[in-house]
Amino acid sequence: MIARIWSGESPLWRLLLPLSWLYGLVSGAIRLSYKLGLKRAWRAPVPVVVVGNLTAGGNGKTPVVIWLVEKLQQRGVRVGVVSRGYGGKAAAYPLLLTPETTTAEAGDEPVLIYQRTGAPVAVAPERAAAVKAILAAHNVQIIITDDGLQHYRLARDIEIVVIDGVRRFGNGWWLPAGPMRERASRLKTVDAAIVNGGVARAGEIPMQLAPGLAVNLRTGARCDVAQLSNIVAMAGIGHPPRFFATLEACGAHPQKCVPLADHQTLAPADVQALVGEGQTLVMTEKDAVKCRAFAEDNWWFLPVDARLSGEQPDKLLQHITSLVR
């Protein structure tokens, strides 16, 4: 229902317009207060790059963060990552991730980024506190924030927006009548707009999510996902249909697709109940970090990597590395 409202297919969005105007007024006032200096943002002693969204829902932001961290690491840059830690609840904040940190404490995306990149990762509702925790423990040269475009309490040097190339901005309205956290005109002020799928427009960076080999959660064995049979697909991400479409494009045709809420807590019994005799469970990598501790032999995940095309990605990376002292 929400997807139909936000896309404009359902006329119910009109009933939510008063709340959307209120949301837009408040969010605009917050940004203006920092722009005019009425509120002061904290500036880190190292450059800060924000990777965020203008809309609610999954746009492919976390793969972009991983891509950016890995590209900077390849250039010899020491990178730290901070996040709000949605879906997790730590005993105390800021929380600096270790190999023992669970998704229940830090959230699924920070754990995924930590496991994929090996970069220092810290989570806290107040992003500045997370940055300070990393700087106190690690000699990093730059900070990447996973989300936080609207978190103006943390000053930033580079802003990158990730856009769903198929859904783009829906009906264009603020939450809750539409998907917008800020108006599309905000794109004029960011340093880069990366478009996941669909057709990128002038000045935007095209991106595709490229699937790899399916990985068994228990053994680490790898195979082409199309070789798996009797698949039940599970996706607890911002936009589950994208994952299901990826499986179809890979030649894997799920018998059943199970969409879950983004950051949803996964209980062992609930996940086990999805899979019948002779079936194979295939999930996203973000779900896998939550399920690995209780995985069954027939559970697999399909990793995806961001693939950015054209000359703009290199120019963006050059711009970012030029800020590193």
Curated annotation (Swiss-Prot):
Involved pathway(s): Glycolipid biosynthesis; lipid IV(A) biosynthesis; lipid IV(A) from (3R)-3-hydroxytetradecanoyl-[acyl-carrier-protein] and UDP-N-acetyl-alpha-D-glucosamine: step 6/6
MF terms (GO), sorted A to Z: ATP binding; tetraacyldisaccharide 4'-kinase activity
Residues the entry annotates as binding ATP: T55, A56, G57, G58, N59, G60, K61, T62
Function: Transfers the gamma-phosphate of ATP to the 4'-position of a tetraacyldisaccharide 1-phosphate intermediate (termed DS-1-P) to form tetraacyldisaccharide 1,4'-bis-phosphate (lipid IVA).
Protein name as catalogued: Tetraacyldisaccharide 4'-kinase
Enzymatic reactions: a lipid A disaccharide + ATP = a lipid IVA + ADP + H(+)
EC number(s) from the headed UniProt entry: 2.7.1.130
The keyword rRNA processing belongs to this UniProt entry's keyword annotation: no
InterPro entries reported in the protein's UniProt record: LpxK, P-loop_NTPase
Gene Ontology terms: biological process: lipid A biosynthetic process; lipopolysaccharide core region biosynthetic process
Organism classification: Bacteria, Pseudomonadati, Pseudomonadota, Gammaproteobacteria, Enterobacterales
Pfam family membership, one: LpxK
Gene: lpxK
Originating organism: Salmonella dublin (strain CT_02021853)
Leading EC class: transferase
